[in-house]
Amino acid sequence: MASDLDIISGALIFDGLPGKQLEQIKDVAISKNYTRGEIIFMEQDMGNGFYLVAEGMVKIFKVSPSGKEQILHVFGPGEPFGEVPVFSGKRFPANAEAIRKSRLLFFPRTAFLGLITAHPSLALNMLAVLSMRLRQFTHQIENLSLKEVPARLAAYLLYLSTEQKREDFITLDISKGQLASLLGTIPETLSRILNRMNKQGLIETKDRTIRFLNREGLESLSIDGKKNELMEKNP
């Protein structure tokens, strides 16, 4: 099992920081364990710090007045979440839940701001991560508002390919129900689209592994799903 220092030093948010600073960051971190399905924080809870996934997986989501859940993002090992309140001192804008047994490193806001004051390079790292997060949410809004579900799915599969550093296949690390919520659709629609992609020779699915048979076709679909016969009218 990786040590807290190894996890911190391997995280993008702390990339390039010298060993002494990493040790100081480790000293303010608090290790917290969560069971599958356990809530980490609720929307409107006071943002008194942020988290880094050491082990497991966490989903960030919102719930509509009717009870419909919309997953906004899923974070795995080495990824931070809940960073915005560190700077704003405001409340969390969404909910966070462990979707598998997880261990998180929690960084209290007051202690972390003290480190940022002492080490401006840490602030630059935080800004880089926040900038990346903004781009991710911009792409997500674009996908949900302008693209049909097949294009959203193709774009997400290609995104996972980049994240997992694999050209020919990816491994789904969340359930199909969770993937459907992330894409703004329902499991039945997602299953139909996956089946059509299989029949058209774009992909081959086996359990949680999806092999790319026609990557160019996926790239084309991700850009303009409306011109592809995979388009679904159902949300």
Q: Where are each of the predicted segments found?
A:
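Cyclic nucleotide-binding regulatory domains
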Residues: 13, 38-101
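Cyclic nucleotide-binding regulatory module and flanking cytosolic helices
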Residues: 1-36, 80, 85-86
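Structural motif
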Residues: 57, 101-103, 178, 209
